[in-house]
Amino acid sequence: MANIARDIFKAYDIRGIVGKTLTDDAAYLIGRAIAAKAAEKGMTRIALGRDGRLSGPELMEHIQRGFTDSGIGVLNVGMVATPMLYFAAINECGGSGVMITGSHNPPDYNGFKMMLGGDTLAGEAIQELLAIVEKDGFVAADKQGNVTEKDISGEYHNHIVGHIKLKRPMKIAIDAGNGVGGAFAGKLYKGLGNEVTELFCDVDGTFPNHHPDPSKPKNLQDLIAALKNGDAEIGLAFDGDADRLGVVTKDGNIIYPDRQLMLFAQDVLNRNPGAKVIFDVKSTRLLAPWIKEHGGEAIMEKTGHSFIKSAMKKTGALVAGEMSGHIFFKERWFGFDDGLYAGARLLEILSASDNPSEVLNNLPQSISTPELNIALPEGSNGHQVIDELAAKAEFEGATEIITIDGLRVEFPDGFGLMRASNTTPILVLRFEADTQAAIERIQNQFKAVIESNPNLIWPL
């Protein structure tokens, strides 16, 4: 039996610490396992790309050898943003591709996001890869798969510039956090006719300025300062592999992705009345009424880019988004999460206004907390912890308890959420209400539930 760290096989992807849990041998074996699944589905070619992390080239070499030793051909697109890899996979490889990325994890992490035949691998499909590795269930190849190298950045760029039309040129600031999006974002937005101020757009896998995670307010402070001190009208920020978008207004307000989705949904519904819109369990309770008000069907899903993509395929939804910043357009695009493209769609909408910040600031808003995290004791299972807490929890005044992903408790004047993260050993909490008093009341109810487990420390 092959020796591989089981805990790198996560819910949405494979992710580990390079050289410790994610080794060169592991990359090779994972390549063999993905190739076995591809062969089973009759696929002969896989697109392969990497982000700007320092460990990317070496991992790429070993996973690629896993493919070719199994007789699977490789379209190697080099260093790209994750959505560019998806673009190559869909247009050149029948929807099969692997992206080597650590997303927003610390610099010593890396991993693989995978799709086969247009389906993103998640949950059980990822556990099947582990089973193949552990049982040596690899395919024997008659001959080596061949490798073709291709720069797809031009095609990707032209595809977007070809159909996104701004009403006027805008002045924008972008912050790539030294992630791979910095290699492409400036050129893309200039190609749409904008004047672009670039922050931290040189790709550097050590992330020397701030962490490339736009879901955390501290990582947007440089962009906020640039907007206040310069003449840019709007700020866009990206995570390490540019499949997530952060948005900041001229006056320094962070427009979280659930509010971004209000604007995107309204735009899509203008052209497609009755369309389905998907959002994740962490989203504002103001979103579903907004979607219905604008003639759409609102669907809540569990958090996770692979789950959302799967739900989009199942329901035929035209647009979706989740609180972490993944925005998915099926209308006029391919249905995968793409921070660069979402930025372009946002500029297309905002260019119709002389005051884009006003448009964003006028979107409905409640009082809410950012995402709050509770560290779990070493070796504990977050989903099990949630189940144990939920079993004895009581919520006075609750109107609905939603259990599709953790516990979301709705009240007449707000909601509280606790769920297990699928990527890190933490519980995630979020609260929203009409008033500060209501948010504190809801938090206190959750605090009592959390503190029933002596190993958990309330984060506020």
UniProtKB/Swiss-Prot annotation:
Which GO terms fall under molecular function for this chain's record?
magnesium ion binding; phosphoglucomutase activity
Q: Which E.C. number(s) belong to this protein?
A: 5.4.2.2
On cofactor binding, the record's note says:
Binds 1 Mg(2+) ion per subunit.
What does the record list as GO biological process? glucose metabolic process
Major localization class: cytoplasm
Entry's Gene Ontology cellular component terms: cytoplasm
The organism's superkingdom is given as: Bacteria
What residues sit in the active site?
103
Query: What does this protein need as cofactor?
Result: Mg(2+)
Q: Which residues bind substrate?
A: 103-104, 113, 243-244, 303, 322-324
Q: Which Pfam families match?
A: PGM_PMM_I (PF02878), PGM_PMM_II (PF02879), PGM_PMM_III (PF02880), PGM_PMM_IV (PF00408)
Cellular compartments annotated? Cytoplasm
Catalysis: reaction(s): alpha-D-glucose 1-phosphate = alpha-D-glucose 6-phosphate
Give the binding site residues for Mg(2+).
Answer: 103, 239, 241, 243
Which SUPFAM superfamilies does this one have?
Phosphoglucomutase, C-terminal domain (SSF55957), Phosphoglucomutase, first 3 domains (SSF53738)
The protein's matches in PANTHER family, at most eight in alphabetical order, are given as:
PHOSPHOMANNOMUTASE, PHOSPHOMANNOMUTASE_PHOSPHOGLUCOMUTASE
Return the similarity comment: Belongs to the phosphohexose mutase family.
Quote the function comment for this protein.
Answer: This enzyme participates in both the breakdown and synthesis of glucose.
Q: What is this protein called?
A: Phosphoglucomutase
**Taxonomic source organism:** Neisseria meningitidis serogroup A / serotype 4A (strain DSM 15465 / Z2491)
